[in-house]
Design a protein with these regions (language model features):
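Bacterial N-terminal signal peptides that target proteins for export
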Residues: 1-8
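Hydrophobic alpha-helical targeting segments used for export or membrane insertion
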Residues: 8-15
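Boundary at the C-terminal end of the N-terminal hydrophobic targeting segment
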Residues: 22-24
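Ankyrin-repeat boundary/"N-cap" motif
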Residues: 26-29, 35-67, 87-97, 120-140
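Terminal, low-structured helical/coil segments at or just beyond the last alpha-helical repeat
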Residues: 136-160
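Ankyrin repeat domain, specifically the short helix-to-loop turn at the C-terminus of the second helix
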Residues: 72-84, 108-117, 153-160
Length: 160
């Protein structure tokens, strides 16, 4: 199944779960479920587990037509008490993921929701370990200079 289809289905399923709809059969068809009925974490029951918000940051990058749905899932997770700064297994918070994917609107959304741009990445990857959002953006701008991140920098600078 194409990743875009899985991500689209996941966004819809998580939205349903977070709004207390009975979508467990559909979510199961993608091999995912909430972990211990916690809307803040998703699992496949075989070792994959990820924080809902950072997973949706990745879905936002992939779903150009369904970004509104992804934002609704993110907002529902935040309203359910999920940690806006909870990192994934690489140490990326949702804000870091949005920076990596070069999504200024999503960066703005996370910052307005209370994401901490000064939170340091804790990662086994030495190149990113200890960087805050500003330093991470600087690293990306130097490593991939042909990708325009000027709008992203403008958003982040408003929160410096």
């Amino acid at each position: 199944m194409p990743a875009k289809t899985i991500a689209a289905g996941l966004a819809i399923m998580v939205c349903g779960l977070l709004t207390n709809n009975a979508w467990s059969d559909s979510l199961a068809s993608f091999g995912l479920r909430t972990k211990d009925k916690n809307p803040c974490r998703l699992t496949d029951g075989r070792g994959f587990e990820a924080p809902t918000i950072v997973l949706m940051a990745g879905a936002y990058d992939k779903l150009s037509k369904d970004k509104v749905v992804v934002l609704e899932v993110i907002d529902a997770a935040i309203n359910a008490g999920c940690d806006i700064d909870e990192p994934d297994e690489l140490g990326f918070s949702p804000l870091n993921a949005a920076i990596l994917y070069n999504e200024p609107a999503l960066v703005e959304h996370f910052l307005q929701a209370g994401a901490d741009p000064y939170r340091r990445i804790v990662s086994s990857r030495a190149s990113i370990d200890g960087l805050d959002a500003f330093e991470f953006l600087h690293l990306l701008m130097n490593k991939v200079p042909n990708q325009d991140r000027t709008p992203l920098r403008a958003v982040l600078e408003r929160y410096q």
